Amino acid sequence: MIVPKDLLIPIFNREIFKGTDRFEVYEGWRDEIPLFSGTYSDCRMRVDSIGKQEYRSLMPEAGEIPGYLDLNQKVIQASGMIDPDMLSGYRERFGKIVDDDEPFRRNVRFYYDTNSLMNNYFFLFREYIPDFTRRASHNTSLGVVSELEDIFDRKLKGHFFPDHFKDVYGKDDEIFHSQPNLYGRSARLAYSEIEYLKKELRVNILTDDGVGDRIILSSFAHDSQKLNLDGVLVTNDHIMAERAGMRMGSWLVRFDLSNVKGLNTRLEYFMEAVYRAAIIYGRVRVNHDIVVSGLWSRKRQEDWNSGHIMVEGCSDRDLERTLSIMSRVPEDFYGKGYYS
């Protein structure tokens, strides 16, 4: 796939050089020396400078990077967004589960932090889990869940689910409905798909809004210790991941999208999610494919470029700003994508 240059620039951690055809990719947000840089020629890009020798092997000899997925993986590998040591145990454990003749979901429960930007998990699963194909979904979070469901269904055909297995997962709604603060992304996901997720996928859908942190972690610990269930905590909240790792011996998946603490999401990360959705899902609809809402940390309207988006609640003014940001997405990307 040849990706237009207008899309490649905002997808990763780059500076946009207006009026030129140059690009730079940095390893860290505050690095002075770019990881690599280059120029565009039509819809292709050429690397002409690599700042660090150890990353030179990541680039093709000819210097051309032909497609989005190829570039995405190289940038992720180079920038350290995915720690191989963190994934090795997960990949090995997951492989053992899917190769087991027994119905493995009786021992595994997924705990989803629904405020996470699930687009990033898609790349993780696609890269590290064999037999992983994307199935279209109208929600970014559900897109990943659907992938896992596909794997489960293929492995579990012909298997019988014991009654005690259903009893265990039937209790999820008690935990879920004790949440007093379901709104925004969580509410949209919950109220549109909760029955499907609970009954068909047997997935814990919990929020991480305030009290949700404790509910996820306590549920994670209880199931691991009392019910002998292995838990997979899917979150981009490093604090939750660290607490979960300290409190029980179960395994988990941790995926930090950024080094920004809490729910504050830099505008650059939001733009990255928007553009990734344009490719992955073939369309971008505000508050639908990507649920964006919240308060801006700066009051000056003209200073939005240096503000934050808080994924928490929504107002008309925030939606207007979101639509303004969305107007930057070239029209060619609407209704199209890598999988379209």
Segments from the language model and where they lie:
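Feature 3881 marks metal-assisted phosphotransfer/nuclease machinery
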Residues: 1-112, 116-231, 239-340
